[in-house]
């Protein structure tokens, strides 16, 4: 399981900058999908206001609402298939608990395909990944590439032997369905 060192700055009572926290945060393996790991690094449901103490903002859902943001790390391993002994009902309950809002954006007809009402800036840290859109187009990406995911329906596929690790900055956005 991957871990990130998260150093957060803040302000003391006199308004002087301080290190508010310095800790390791670990990802969570998706239930029933042992090759996918998600790590919520930081986020807020509202615009941040300063000065502050550097305490973690309170937020619940995986995706940010308008005015909010998330920073997350995603690791997708090769052969992203369900574990042979997984129970769909148990996995769904655990996903709903650990990653609120994630199931709601998934396309039940196309495994892995999803759309959120966010703009996502996805930077490939290492490995390779294929981005598939609902028009059938597929784009191969590698370490150093950046995807600006503009509330489009998409899926990620890892056809290679090594895991792909991505860092995402996710901002809440307005989305109006085409007529």
Spell out what each predicted region is.
Residues 7, 11-12, 16-21, 27-28, ...:
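Double-stranded beta-helix
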Residues 108-116, 121-142:
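A short beta-strand-loop-beta hairpin characteristic of the jelly-roll/cupin
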Residues 3-5, 116-117:
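Short, small/polar residue-rich loop motifs at catalytic or cofactor-binding pockets
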Residues 69, 77-81, 136-138, 142-145, ...:
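Ligand-binding loop in jelly-roll beta-barrel domains
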Residues 26-30, 58, 81-82, 140, ...:
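A short local loop/turn or secondary-structure capping micro-motif enriched for an aromatic residue
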Residues 24, 72-116, 150-153:
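Conserved short histidine dyad/triad with adjacent acidic residue
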Residues 28-78:
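Short, well-structured hydrophobic secondary-structure segments
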């Amino acid at each position: 399981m991957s871990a990130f060192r998260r150093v957060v700055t803040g302000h003391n009572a006199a308004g002087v900058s301080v290190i508010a926290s310095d800790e390791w945060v670990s990802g969570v393996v998706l239930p029933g999908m042992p090759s996918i790991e998600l790590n919520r690094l930081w986020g807020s449901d509202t615009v941040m206001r300063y000065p502050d103490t550097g305490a973690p903002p309170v937020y619940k859902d995986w995706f940010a609402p308008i005015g909010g943001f998330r920073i997350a790390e995603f690791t997708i391993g090769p052969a992203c298939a369900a574990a042979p002994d997984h129970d769909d009902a148990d996995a769904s309950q655990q996903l709903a608990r650990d990653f609120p809002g994630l199931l709601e954006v998934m396309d039940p007809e196309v495994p892995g395909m999803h759309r959120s009402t966010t703009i996502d800036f996805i930077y490939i840290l290492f490995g390779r990944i294929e981005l598939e859109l609902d028009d059938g187009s597929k784009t191969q990406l590698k370490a150093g590439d950046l995807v600006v995911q503009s509330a489009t329906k998409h899926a990620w596929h890892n056809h290679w032997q090594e895991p792909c690790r991505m860092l995402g900055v996710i901002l809440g956005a307005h989305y109006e369905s085409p007529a």
